């Protein structure tokens, strides 16, 4: 591994997860995630290695941090949304769940750029994305019934489309909020399928 030059810094960053996470993400983006160790992150953040691992036990935890908040908010959104149309129910609830990210756009953009940069990094989040997908699948099955492939198919399509939109947003440096971009994109997605259905 290339030698890592310690950067000059002023007041050390505390073990606040947001501050430490942003420090790590900047290093990963600037130097390459494969070239930065967690020890390097601890040095740059001005904290001990043990304190770093209490906050983030791995690189994957840094990059995919925040997914637990999204899945918890998704459960709340789905439970409290009275919409009976499956499409509208999922659209509104998923966009609402991702609104928790709108107050940390710089951090989220760095995370998504890293996720888009490598299939391996993307794969680190498979379990968390699958958890969100299963929550969506259960919500669809509750409305439509469980005895078909549709709940799994629709939930999988929503996750895949959303990740495509979010990584595009990060790489394009679009200045809109995540929810604004996702809301518009999902509306377009719905329109495309509506047009296809009308053409049958």
Identify what each model region corresponds to.
Residues 101, 112, 140, 165-173, ...:
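Secondary-structure edge/capping motif, primarily at the C-terminal ends of alpha-helices
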Residues 1-3, 138, 142, 174-200:
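C-terminal peripheral helix-coil segments that are non-catalytic and often amphipathic
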Residues 72-111:
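Hydrophobic alpha-helical connector segments
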Residues 46-56:
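Short hydrophobic/aromatic patch on the recognition helix
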Residues 103, 129-155:
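Hydrophobic alpha-helical bundle segments that form small-molecule/ligand-binding pockets
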Residues 60-62:
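A secondary-structure capping/hinge motif
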Residues 1-31, 35-47, 64, 69, ...:
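Basic, helix-initiating cap at the start of DNA-binding domains
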Residues 115, 148-169, 180-192:
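Hydrophobic alpha-helical segments that form the core
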């Amino acid at each position: 591994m290339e030698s890592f030059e310690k950067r000059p810094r002023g007041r050390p960053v505390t073990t606040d997860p947001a501050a430490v996470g942003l420090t790590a993400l900047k290093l990963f983006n600037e130097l390459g995630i494969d070239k930065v160790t967690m020890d390097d992150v601890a040095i740059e953040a001005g904290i001990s290695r043990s304190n770093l691992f209490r906050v983030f036990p791995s690189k994957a935890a840094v990059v995919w941090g925040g997914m637990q908040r999204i899945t918890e908010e998704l459960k709340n959104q789905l439970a409290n949304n009275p919409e009976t149309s499956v499409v509208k129910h999922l659209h509104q609830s998923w966009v609402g769940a991702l609104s928790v990210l709108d107050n940390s756009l710089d951090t989220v953009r760095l995370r998504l750029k890293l996720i888009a940069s490598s299939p391996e990094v993307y794969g680190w989040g498979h379990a968390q994305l699958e958890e969100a997908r299963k929550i969506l699948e259960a919500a669809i099955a509750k409305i439509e019934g469980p005895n078909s492939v549709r709940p799994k198919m629709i939930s999988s399509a929503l996750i895949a489309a959303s990740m495509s939109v979010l990584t595009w947003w990060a790489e394009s440096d679009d200045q809109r909020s995540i929810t604004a971009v996702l809301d518009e994109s999902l509306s377009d997605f719905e329109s495309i399928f509506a047009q296809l259905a009308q053409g049958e």
